[in-house]
């Protein structure tokens, strides 16, 4: 949600851990004072990450599927311009989401990420290209965003 083009849209209560129900009872009430604090902190961190990296707001966008379990979003500003042709710092961000319950390893080429040789994830992991490729391990039902350095 925070890596794709457009304004992030969060369904009522997702940030607090509210679970849905079947129609017509689509949503439970908001748990005022009982929010899932870990979930709330994660949403706040994702919003701060997007606000701190303009490429996540206005960079060119491409979708990838490096394996059947993983969906990826690549956002790039190249040649000093963003997707709208406005002046922007060159940057590249990659978000990978593992839809599988098991850990997977995916491979990205340096060309996928604007020729970068190093990627730094939102949680501080550092990935270095070896022979022009990155090997990225993603835990089951998890995601990560990495920035080219």
What are these regions (language model features)?
Residues 1, 13, 46, 94, ...:
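Hydrophobic, well-ordered secondary-structure elements that form the walls
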Residues 2, 6, 21, 47, ...:
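Hydrophobic alpha-helix feature that most strongly marks membrane-spanning transmembrane helices
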Residues 2-37:
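Aromatic/acidic polysaccharide-binding cleft in carbohydrate-active enzymes
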Residues 12-14, 20, 34, 75, ...:
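Active-site proximal loops enriched in glycine and acidic residues that flank catalytic Cys/His/Asp
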Residues 30-67, 71:
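Aromatic- and carboxylate-lined catalytic core of secreted/periplasmic carbohydrate-active enzymes
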Residues 64-113:
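Carbohydrate-binding surface patches
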Residues 110-124:
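Solvent-exposed beta-hairpin/edge-strand motifs
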Residues 129-149:
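C-terminal beta-strand-rich structural cap/linker in extracellular carbohydrate-active enzymes
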């Amino acid at each position: 949600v925070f890596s794709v083009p457009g304004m992030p849209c969060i369904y009522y209560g997702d940030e607090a851990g509210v679970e849905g129900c079947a129609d017509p009872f689509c949503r439970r009430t908001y748990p005022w004072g009982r929010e899932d604090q870990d979930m709330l902190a994660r949403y706040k961190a994702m919003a701060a990450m997007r606000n701190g990296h303009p490429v996540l707001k206005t960079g060119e966008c491409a979708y990838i599927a490096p394996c059947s379990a993983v969906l990826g979003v690549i956002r790039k500003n190249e040649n000093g311009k963003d997707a709208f042709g406005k002046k922007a710092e060159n940057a590249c961000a990659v978000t990978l989401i593992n839809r599988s319950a098991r850990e997977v390893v995916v491979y990205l080429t340096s060309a996928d990420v604007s020729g970068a040789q190093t990627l730094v994830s939102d949680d501080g992991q550092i990935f270095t290209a070896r022979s022009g490729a990155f090997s990225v391990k993603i835990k089951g039902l998890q995601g990560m965003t990495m920035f080219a350095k």
